[in-house]
Amino acid sequence: MDLNLRGRTALITGASKGIGIASAECLAAEGVNVILVSRTQADLDAARARIAGRHNVTVEVHAYDLSDSRNVDRLAETHPDIDILVNNAGAIPGGDLQAITEDRWRAAWDLKVFGYINMCRRFYAEMKSRNRGVIINILGMAGEKMDRTYIAGSTGNAALMAFTKALGGSAGDDGLRVVGINPGAIATDRLITLMKTRAQSQFGDENRWQEFMKPLPMGRAGKPEEIGAMVALLASDLSAYTSGTIITIDGGAANRGPMF
């Protein structure tokens, strides 16, 4: 299916790995020119080579830490005319209330929670001036299925869910759309590394990590490209009446028992 996205431009944060690069690839496959943002230049260079080698689109990269709002300003000044913004940067540490110090909590939220808010503030204004644009916030299932052992992440994602709904609810008045995606367990490098560490600790064999996937819906974690495909669909005009809502992609896990 042609999503009629060819020639548009998307800026994706957290774009060098996992859901970020999968989203960039799915958009590039539809002919979207992509701007990749993450903190590590080497990873960005690899991502650029990968996408440019597979798709006939323009690929630009910026190594920025988006917990610093000055870098958000730099991006908006350099790329004021983007059509699609995909917020994906940020990893919030696990742990209960006593395990996460104030400094760790604030640092994590500066990147993900306030990073998303700052990106939306700047790029929403630019899009509004042109009366068109789509913002897609990649959130996390912990925002709807609360977990005391991931309290900073659950609270942060819940806050961003509310933010996305509040902003997207009236975005149509400005010619824009704002939507969110709540991924469940997704087989990113980060998740696989965590599961290998757990398998080594529990079984003495990191290669048994896939055994932890069996309790998940359908007996597996989701694939990054399954999130990327939804990003492309939501970015397209096929989703022109979709705004102020959150799409959960977790195989049904939010309505089951514990994942692990």
Specify the residue positions occupied by each region the protein language model found.
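Short C-terminal tail/terminal secondary-structure segment
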Residues: M1, R6, I19, K145, ...
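Conserved glycine-rich Rossmann-like NAD(P)H-binding loop of the short-chain dehydrogenase/reductase
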Residues: E30-A46
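Substrate-binding pocket helix/loop in short-chain dehydrogenase/reductase
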Residues: D96-L97, R104-W109, F212
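Active-site loop-to-helix junction immediately N-terminal to the catalytic Tyr of the SDR YXXXK motif
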Residues: I100, M146-T155, A166, M259
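Active-site helix of classical SDR
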Residues: C120, G156-N157, T164
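Alpha-helical segment proximal to the catalytic Tyr-Lys
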Residues: A125, G169-S170, A240
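Short, small/polar-rich loop/turn modules that mediate ligand/substrate recognition or access, typified
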Residues: G172, R177, T242-G244
